[in-house]
A protein has these predicted regions:
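Structured loop/turn residues at beta-strand edges in well-structured enzyme cores
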Residues: 43, 107, 131
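Amide-donor transfer/coupling interface in amidating biosynthetic enzymes
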Residues: 2-5, 27-30, 72, 77-78, ...
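Histidine-centered active-site/metal-ligand motif
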Residues: 8, 108, 139
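Cysteine-nucleophile active-site neighborhood
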Residues: 50-123
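Helical cap/lid subdomains and adjacent loops of hydrolase enzymes that gate the active-site channel
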Residues: 12, 19, 110, 132-137
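N-terminal beta1-alpha1 cap of cysteine-dependent amidohydrolase-like domains
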Residues: 1-79
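Short loop/helix-cap segments at secondary-structure boundaries that form the rim of catalytic
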Residues: 38-43, 92-94, 144-147
């Protein structure tokens, strides 16, 4: 399996997601559009992971690649290929499907326990993590779920 990873800032790396992908013998392509590297024009991997960054999901004027990234994420899902959006990545995925991005309204910083839903327990990836596990959050933006 080939997985495309998008890193949206020089300080955000694939970390434990990369470790898990390496352990699964996945081939990894890393895209760094923040550095000027162009994104692929269409889905060219089996799955896509989009990480966070300090920008908001609507900072098109300072990060002009964001609309193309949202479109690329939608193109992956249109082909029924998995997409994982983390932090900014989840905000961009919501944007791609018509969700509204809300800036500076969800001030959340620190460790918080996350629990899997029934769908999470049935997921082939998430089913491998504990029912409840700690994550570190550091954000102030959020989004509404897209229609449907």
């Amino acid at each position: 399996m080939r997985v495309a990873i998008v890193e949206n800032t020089r300080i955000t790396h694939h970390g434990q997601v990369g470790v898990a992908l390496h352990e699964a013998a996945a081939l990894i392509d890393i895209w760094r559009p923040w550095s000027g590297q162009p994104l692929p024009a269409s889905p060219d991997a089996d799955a896509l992971v989009v990480f966070g960054g300090e920008q908001s999901a609507v900072d098109d004027h300072t990060h002009p690649y964001l609309p193309a990234l949202a479109e690329l994420m939608a193109a992956y899902t249109a082909l029924d290929r998995p997409v994982l959006g983390i932090c900014l990545g989840s905000q961009l995925l919501a944007r791609a499907y018509g969700g509204d991005n809300h800036l500076g309204v969800a001030l959340e910083f620190g460790w918080v326990d996350v629990s899997l839903t029934d769908a999470g327990r049935a997921d082939p990836v998430l089913s491998q993590v504990p029912q409840t596990f700690p994550i570190f959050q550091w954000h102030s933006d959020t989004f509404t779920l897209p229609p449907g």
